[in-house]
Curated annotation (Swiss-Prot):
<protein>
    <recommendedName>
        <fullName>Small ribosomal subunit protein uS15</fullName>
    </recommendedName>
</protein>
<comment type="function">
    <text>One of the primary rRNA binding proteins, it binds directly to 16S rRNA where it helps nucleate assembly of the platform of the 30S subunit by binding and bridging several RNA helices of the 16S rRNA.</text>
</comment>
<comment type="function">
    <text>Forms an intersubunit bridge (bridge B4) with the 23S rRNA of the 50S subunit in the ribosome.</text>
</comment>
<keyword id="KW-0694">RNA-binding</keyword>
<dbReference type="GO" id="GO:0003735">
    <property type="term" value="F:structural constituent of ribosome"/>
</dbReference>
<dbReference type="InterPro" id="IPR009068">
    <property type="entry name" value="uS15_NS1_RNA-bd_sf"/>
</dbReference>
<dbReference type="GO" id="GO:0022627">
    <property type="term" value="C:cytosolic small ribosomal subunit"/>
</dbReference>
<dbReference type="InterPro" id="IPR000589">
    <property type="entry name" value="Ribosomal_uS15"/>
</dbReference>
<dbReference type="InterPro" id="IPR005290">
    <property type="entry name" value="Ribosomal_uS15_bac-type"/>
</dbReference>
<dbReference type="GO" id="GO:0006412">
    <property type="term" value="P:translation"/>
</dbReference>
<comment type="similarity">
    <text>Belongs to the universal ribosomal protein uS15 family.</text>
</comment>
<comment type="subunit">
    <text>Part of the 30S ribosomal subunit. Forms a bridge to the 50S subunit in the 70S ribosome, contacting the 23S rRNA.</text>
</comment>
<keyword id="KW-0699">rRNA-binding</keyword>
<keyword id="KW-0687">Ribonucleoprotein</keyword>
<keyword id="KW-0689">Ribosomal protein</keyword>
<dbReference type="GO" id="GO:0019843">
    <property type="term" value="F:rRNA binding"/>
</dbReference>
<dbReference type="Pfam" id="PF00312">
    <property type="entry name" value="Ribosomal_S15"/>
</dbReference>
Length: 74
């Protein structure tokens, strides 16, 4: 259910500012978005998986905070 190493590397490659940039807000938001998409698909098939639903809410909250931070910085 989690992103594979190759998927994460591809996301980092597409959204990084420079080589090996894993900590920038853009990269973190992109990774969270991919994880949220996977969790949403999982929850469509398993609607009573409350542990995953909580994880989805936490990831959404973290992404929202990062987007707000990025908007304030730029």
């Amino acid at each position: 259910m989690a992103l594979t190493k190759e998927q994460k590397q591809e996301i980092i490659k597409q959204n990084s500012r420079f080589a090996k940039d894993t900590g920038s807000s853009e990269v973190q938001i992109a990774i969270l978005s991919a994880e949220i998409k996977q969790l949403s698909e999982h929850l469509k098939q398993h609607p009573h998986d409350f542990h995953s639903k909580r994880g989805l809410f936490m990831k959404n909250s973290k992404r929202r905070d990062l987007v707000k931070y990025l908007a304030n910085q730029n």
